[in-house]
């Protein structure tokens, strides 16, 4: 099976009531771990790369690593997704490099730091949708800024994140604006702001509805029942990995991620894509620290990196099971980008909101 568009997987997930973890990748070991977990659980795969990942690995290296995964595991549907595109040009360069899905994050201006107006967000996202859909490529948009409801601050990831602090009106997606945004842009997926943020330091205490607004997802889903929703910054920050890192010389303070049971609530309310990066970073770090400490005389990097694949595979397999993704890869039928482009052109994939349906 060739690379597939995101819309194919999200439509299947919606029809069958499950969510799909979208794992960020930078290197060979991450891709191997994710695909091993996918084969183990018969799960479809979303591999996503930030601008930072593309710069770190190099366009050609990253593209060929993912294409190698497609060749090695032809029975697993794989999406190649651009995470947090800061401008149309970023999305277009991703499409040129075989990405089958792009995120136009117009919640921030092109500097990836300044919160953007609603009008700006609509305009840049719609521009990308028009170009991408003509090629059969899927588009994810974002409304609201990712950041902590505890502090009002965001966590920059690869240079992407607002500076300073914002109030709750900017940190929570407005349901009315969400309806207007989806109608105006026709995005395939909508990332919503509910109090999550990038990195390991998401919450200083176990999150409750006061600082993790799953109820906002439920409200948006009631207004947009046919729209695929996305949760960003949704690593769960496993306590066992934190403990292992600190046991072998780390110094990560007490911190909390997004509980799996809260993500599962989101999936019941239309969340189809769940972004995860930190959990795999913690798995790598725990494995490498442990291997280095137990055999300090070792100098072959494979001694440190092979355990990291095992640790990440365990995390990924757990998420595939917990989100209901497992068992679905073999049920998804290939549809080409060309066929998707034709469907977009005919209006067959237009998102119809409740508000639009009443008109």
UniProtKB/Swiss-Prot annotation:
Top-level enzyme category: lyase
InterPro entries assigned: Aldolase_TIM, Class_II_FBP_aldolase, FBA_II, Fruct_bisP_Calv
Entries under CDD domains matching the protein: TBP_aldolase_IIB
Active site: 83 (proton donor)
Swiss-Prot/TrEMBL keywords: Glycolysis, Lyase, Metal-binding, Zinc
Chain residues that bind Zn(2+) 1: 84, 198, 232
Residues engaged in binding D-glyceraldehyde 3-phosphate: 50
Enzyme Commission designation: 4.1.2.13
GO molecular function: fructose-bisphosphate aldolase activity; zinc ion binding
Residue intervals passing through the bilayer: none
Similarity comment: family membership: Belongs to the class II fructose-bisphosphate aldolase family.
Role of this protein: Catalyzes the aldol condensation of dihydroxyacetone phosphate (DHAP or glycerone-phosphate) with glyceraldehyde 3-phosphate (G3P) to form fructose 1,6-bisphosphate (FBP) in gluconeogenesis and the reverse reaction in glycolysis.
Protein name: Fructose-bisphosphate aldolase
């Amino acid at each position: 099976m060739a690379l597939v568009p995101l819309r194919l997987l999200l439509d299947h997930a919606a029809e069958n009531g499950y969510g799909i973890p979208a794992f960020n990748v930078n290197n060979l070991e991450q891709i191997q771990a994710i695909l091993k977990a996918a084969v183990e659980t018969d799960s479809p795969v979303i591999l996503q790369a930030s601008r930072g990942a593309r710069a770190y690995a190099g366009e050609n290296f990253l593209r060929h690593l993912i294409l190698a995964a497609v060749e090695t595991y032809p029975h697993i549907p794989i999406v190649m997704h651009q995470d947090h595109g800061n401008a149309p040009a970023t999305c277009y360069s991703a499409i040129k490099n075989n990405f089958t899905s792009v995120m136009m994050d117009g919640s921030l201006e092109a500097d990836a730091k300044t919160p953007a107006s609603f009008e700006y967000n609509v305009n840049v996202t719609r521009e990308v949708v028009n170009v991408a859909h003509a090629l059969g490529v899927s588009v994810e948009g974002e409304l609201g800024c990712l950041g902590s409801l505890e502090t009002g601050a965001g966590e920059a990831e690869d240079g992407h994140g607002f500076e300073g602090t914002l109030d709750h009106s900017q940190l929570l997606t407005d349901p009315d604006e969400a309806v207007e945004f989806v109608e105006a842009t026709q995005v395939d997926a909508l990332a919503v702001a509910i109090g999550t943020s990038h990195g390991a330091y998401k919450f200083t205490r176990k999150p409750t509805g006061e600082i993790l607004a799953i109820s906002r997802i439920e409200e948006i889903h009631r207004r947009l029942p046919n729209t695929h929703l996305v949760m960003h910054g949704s690593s769960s920050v496993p306590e066992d990995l934190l403990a292992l890192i600190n046991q072998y010389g780390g110094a990560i303070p007490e911190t909390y991620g997004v509980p799996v049971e809260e993500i599962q609530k989101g999936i019941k309310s239309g969340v189809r894509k769940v972004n995860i990066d930190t959990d795999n970073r913690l798995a790598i770090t725990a494995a490498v620290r442990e291997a280095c400490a137990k055999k300090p005389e070792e100098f072959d990097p494979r001694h440190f990196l092979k355990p990291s694949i095992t640790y990440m595979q365990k995390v990924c397999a757990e998420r595939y099971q917990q989100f209901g993704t497992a068992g679905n890869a073999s049920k998804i039928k290939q549809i080409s980008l060309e066929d998707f482009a034709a469907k977009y052109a005919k209006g067959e994939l237009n998102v119809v909101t409740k508000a639009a349906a009443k008109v």
